[in-house]
Swiss-Prot record:
Organism: Zea mays
Cellular localisation: Cytoplasm, Cytoskeleton
Keywords: Cytoplasm, Cytoskeleton, GTP-binding, Magnesium, Metal-binding, Microtubule, Nucleotide-binding
GO CC term, one of those recorded: cytoplasm
Cofactor needs: Mg(2+)
Record's protein name: Tubulin beta-1 chain
Entry binding sites for GTP: Q11, E69, S138, G142, T143, G144, N204, N226
Amino acid sequence: MREILHIQGGQCGNQIGAKFWEVVCAEHGIDATGRYGGDSDLQLERVNVYYNEASCGRFVPRAVLMDLEPGTMDSVRSGPYGHIFRPDNFVFGQSGAGNNSAKGHYTEGAELIDSVLDVVRKEAENCDCLQGFQVCHSLGGGTGSAMGTLLISKIREEYPDRMMLTFSVFPSPKVSDTVVEPYNATLSVHQLVENADECMVLDNEALYDICFRTLKLTTPSFGDLNHLISATMSGVTCCLRFPGQLNSDLRKLAVNLIPFPRLHFFMVGFAPLTSRGSQQYRALTVPELTQQMWDAKNMMCAADPRHGRYLTASAMFRGKMSTKEVDEQMLNVQNKNSSYFVEWIPNNVKSTVCDIPPHGLKMASTFIGNSTSIQEMFRRVSEQFTAMFRRKAFLHWYTGEGMDEMEFTEAESNMNDLVSEYQQYQDATADEEGEYEDEEEGDLQD
């Protein structure tokens, strides 16, 4: 029933993915060997969304792991849940992409992509009714960004009617790992705009801020950051895996969140986030969750929702709570902050309630918002891209692998178009929308 196939690519994607499977295993009561050791039938009822049951009663994740170098794969394999994955589903090259997206998209990645697609096909054939794919990758490196988007476009050709959800780690504004991040990110966004259905935007700096400010961690590690991401990932699909009062799936999510097909880049947030020290001083209530969930400091990407307006948003609550209270709180948010929502989409906040809370919590909520302020993120990457591209800096690394300068120009203009589309809908008012329609009708009559 409604399976989701999980794909992780590159170093970042594999590290997030490894953490994600730890979280999902804990929720379904599955131990590191793939055996079930939980205490509730609900954990097994829809375990097949993310797991395949093998003949000996082991649960095997529906996951495909790919990378262009064996390093990260080895660390996943030797990690706590390394033996749960099917050994054939590790697909890796030897040379690495070296942060060069031309290698990941055209040379090294293109050689490996067929074997990845074979594994994806095998997994998809095992599914009863495949709902879609979720891809974890970063956009700054070479493998996750370029080979990830190459795989997405290939899967798009083969499974055009299945949902494609991505968790994409964008380059951070101040923290940068590599100098060519703006190139790789722009080339990837160019692909994601066309081929992905829903794109959850994350970035390390915002996650670090949450760890410092909210969780009061003095030295956050990537493990802590990935834990935040995996809590959100698990929240997005909880309705598929556990019974709830108001269910949603990937397609319902897309229909409720995407007013225009190109604008499918979402901000995500998670509540409750509290530091270990102050946990016992906080009551977990629906108002408290709602307040924290809509807080700008809680967003996992470096864009401030107060600088733009929400086109749509979706809140997924988990735990035993009254739906009436959830609806009241959501209405309350919309009424108090009406200037932050566009007025030409009525009822633009969807809420979902799932009865089973995450492991170790009484209640939790996941937030997904389609806000025009995400353009800050694209604009920032675009400025960095232009600064380097104007001088053709580092370009020989890409053209040497067979890329053309025109591709860069195309990707740049696509990114700039995206920014101006977000800006256009941020400025639009209800009256203008009416005028557009009148003009269009006038044109038709002519």
